[in-house]
């Protein structure tokens, strides 16, 4: 089978343009955040979702009512209504934990694990879509 250079070029461009759309920096929700440690690697608290929330884009988490949410950061300033965290997949791990943001109003914090007192700047990786 002979493939024309134009067709080959279109195929290559479509593959690479799809990758660039998936991996990209998104607009920052806030300039500062509160974390439990300097790396934001320790959860601040555990919370339970009070209602479903469907993620509007790749920066956010889709959360279902009753799910346990691990809160890793709390945005400050213009993004203060959003927290960052993760929800676990099912018990057997079919779904990997995914980090993202969600409205703080849809969860109830049930257990504080470590106070979120470390005030730090957000960076482009905090809002990067994979």
Swiss-Prot record:
Leader peptide range in chain numbering: 1-22
Pfam families, per database record: SH3_2
Sequence intervals crossing the membrane: none
Entry PTM: May possess two intramolecular disulfide bonds.
This protein's GO CC annotations: extracellular region
Tissues expressed in: Cartilage primordia and cartilage.
Example of a GO MF term: growth factor activity
Record GO biological process: cell-matrix adhesion; extracellular matrix organization
Induction comment from the UniProt entry of this chain: Repressed by retinoic acid.
Limits of the SH3 domain: 42-112
Coiled coil: none
Family matches, as SUPFAM superfamilies: SH3-domain
Keywords: Disulfide bond, Growth factor, Secreted, SH3 domain, Signal
Disulfide bridge partners, by residue number: 35-40, 58-129
Subunit description: Interacts with FASLG.
Family, per entry: Belongs to the MIA/OTOR family.
Purpose: May function during cartilage development and maintenance.
Protein name, per record: Melanoma-derived growth regulatory protein
Organism (species): Rattus norvegicus (Rat)
Lineage: Eukaryota, Metazoa, Chordata, Craniata, Vertebrata
Gene name of this polypeptide: Mia
């Amino acid at each position: 089978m002979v493939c024309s250079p134009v067709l080959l070029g279109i195929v290559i461009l479509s593959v690479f343009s799809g990758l660039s759309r998936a991996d990209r920096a998104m607009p920052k929700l806030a300039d500062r955040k509160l974390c439990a440690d300097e790396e934001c690697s320790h959860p601040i608290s555990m919370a339970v979702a009070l209602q479903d929330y469907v993620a509007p884009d790749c920066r956010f988490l889709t959360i279902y009512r009753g799910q346990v949410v691990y809160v890793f950061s709390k945005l400050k300033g213009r993004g203060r209504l959003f927290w960052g965290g993760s929800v676990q997949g099912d018990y057997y791990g079919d779904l990997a934990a995914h980090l993202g943001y969600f409205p703080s109003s849809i969860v109830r914090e049930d257990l504080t694990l470590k106070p979120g007192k470390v005030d730090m700047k957000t960076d482009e990786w905090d809002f990067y879509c994979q």
